C-alpha cells in the first residue's frame, strides 16, 4: 500500500503571488472612504496641535520630578529630532514646545483646565475613531478610557526613553571596543527605533478597541505604520529640500504649515494602519463578494438565515459572525448591519460564551435563529431590507403574495457553498 505524499505548505513567494491584492486594495479604499478617515485625520490634526503643549508639559513634569531620568529626556528629545519628525522642522518645533511647556506652569486654574480638556478631547477622538473602524458598538466607560490613555502618555515616554538610553549605552560601549561599528550591529541599533514605533502602534491597535484584536494582526498594522512613517518622513524631507515653497512664502513662519502637513500625514498613516489591522482577518480569508447591487442586504439576510437554520440541529446551535462572513465570502463588517436588523426583528439572538472575560479573545458572540420559519411571516424582513409597503407598490405586494408568504418558503433553497 502506497503512502500518501506529505502535503508541502506553499512558500512565501506563492502566498504573495496568490494573495488577493486587488480585492484588498478595494476593501481598504472603501473602508477609508466610508469611514471618512480623511476628514477624521484633519480633525485629529487640529486637536493634536492644541494638545501638543499639554502632553509635552506632562512629559517634562515627569522628567523634572525625577532627576534620575534627565538622561532619558535628552535621549528622547534626540530621538524625536532624528526619527519621528522631519529634520527640517524638528529642532524648531521641539524648541517651541519646550518654551510653551515651561510657561504652562504660569497659567491659572482656568487656563490649565482648558489644556486638560484639550488633551482629553484628543484622547476621546482617537478612542472613538479606532472603535468606529472596528465597528464597536459599546465603548469602555469614560473613566477607564481616560485612565488607559493617561497611563500611556505618562509611562510611554519613560519606557521609550529607557530603551533608547540602553541602546545608546551599548552603542557607546561597542565603539570603545572597536574602531568602527560593524554594519550588522549598526543595522540592529537603527532597527530599535523602528521597532519601538511599531510596538507602540501595535499596542494602540490591540488595547484601544473594545473588542478582541489578535497580537499578530496588531503587529502587522504597527509594522505598516512604522514603514510608512519612515517613507513619509524621507519623502517630505526630500520635497522640502528640493522645493522650498513654504520657506519662500512664509519665511520664519514656515514651521507651522509644515508641521500641520506632517501631523496630517502621520494621522492618515495611523488610521490606515488601523484599517489594515481591522480588516486583515477578512483579507486573509479572501473576500470574493463586494456590495453594490440592489438588494444586497436582503440577499445577505436570506443567506444568513439559511445558514443559521442549518445550524439549529448542530451542537453549537449557531455561528459566529466571523464564521458567517467566511461562508458568505464577504467582509464581516458588511454583514454587521444585516445582523442588527435581524436582531431588531427578534429573529436572531446572540449567546455569549460563559466564563470569558470581556475584551479577551473568544468574546465574539454566537448568533442563533430564534423563530420558527414555518410560522414566521416574511413581510417584516421584506419591509425592512427590500421594499417598504406603499400605495405605489401595493399592487406588487398583492400579486406576488408577499404578505402571505412565510420565512420557510424563502429558506427552502440551500445556501451557496
UniProtKB/Swiss-Prot annotation:
Q: How does it sit in the membrane?
A: Multi-pass membrane protein
Give the domain of life. Answer: Bacteria
Q: Which UniProt keywords apply?
A: Cell inner membrane, Cell membrane, Membrane, Transmembrane, Transmembrane helix
Q: Does the keyword ATP-binding apply?
A: no
InterPro entries assigned? UPF0761_bac, Virul_fac_BrkB
Segments passing through the bilayer: 49-69, 106-126, 146-166, 187-207, 235-255, 256-276
Predominant cellular place of this UniProt entry's protein: membrane
Give me the Gene Ontology terms describing cellular component.
plasma membrane
Subcellular location(s) per record: Cell inner membrane
The record's section on PANTHER family has: INNER MEMBRANE PROTEIN YHJD, UPF0761 MEMBRANE PROTEIN YIHY
State the family named in the UniProt similarity comment for this chain. Belongs to the UPF0761 family.
What is the official name of this protein in its record?
Answer: UPF0761 membrane protein Daci_4966
Organism whose genome encodes this protein: Delftia acidovorans (strain DSM 14801 / SPH-1)
